[in-house]
């Protein structure tokens, strides 16, 4: 079940609900253990160490604090929840991914920085010009604009600096602009993803 869910979202750290804990396995466990300074353990204790499955976990009731720390570091987290009561399950407990959290899609107040918007943006660029959209899904605030002409880059950078998005989705044309990518990553500490 875990491997099937992880295959659906290989770019996410998978928080897999097992009883009162969210568990991470394999490379996710190694990464989370290092990033959050958690103890790395393993399954299959009877096997040689090289064949054991690395794992680490966090209590489900305090998972938001751990997720917030991972999001602040730019990671994406997929939450895989138990969809039925384990006591009533016949065989494996049915599980499904109920939420994917990225730096720009945080909605839980405990994960948000007080007094600061949490914008996600989309930048579309082609030979005709540049389109730009900002949205803070925690407040519903949204802004859309476009730029053409010789001052388009200046306007684009001004708007990006004004809104300071936590995450940016870039079209192929925008992603191929090295200066734009550097500005977003190095100046704004923004997580990037490519959209087609």
What does each model-found stretch correspond to?
Residues 1-195:
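Basic, polar low-complexity surface loops/patches
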């Amino acid at each position: 079940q875990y491997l099937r869910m992880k295959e659906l979202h290989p770019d996410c750290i998978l928080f897999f609900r097992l009883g009162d804990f969210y568990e991470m396995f394999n490379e996710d466990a190694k990464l989370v253990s290092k990033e959050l300074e958690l103890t790395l353990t393993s399954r299959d204790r009877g096997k040689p160490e090289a064949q054991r499955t690395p794992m680490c976990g966090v209590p489900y009731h305090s998972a938001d604090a751990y997720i917030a720390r991972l999001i602040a570091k730019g990671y994406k987290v997929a939450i895989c929840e138990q969809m039925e009561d384990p006591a009533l399950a016949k065989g494996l407990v049915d599980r499904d991914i109920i939420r994917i959290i990225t730096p720009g899609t945080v909605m839980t107040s405990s994960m948000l920085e007080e007094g600061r918007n949490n914008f996600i943006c989309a930048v579309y660029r082609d030979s005709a010009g540049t389109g730009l959209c900002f949205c803070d899904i925690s407040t519903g605030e949204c802004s859309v604009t476009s730029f053409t002409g010789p001052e388009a880059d200046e306007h684009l950078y001004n708007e990006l600096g004004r809104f300071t998005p936590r995450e940016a989705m870039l079209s192929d044309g925008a992603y191929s602009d090295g200066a734009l990518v550097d500005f977003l990553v190095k100046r704004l500490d923004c997580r990037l993803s490519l959209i087609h």
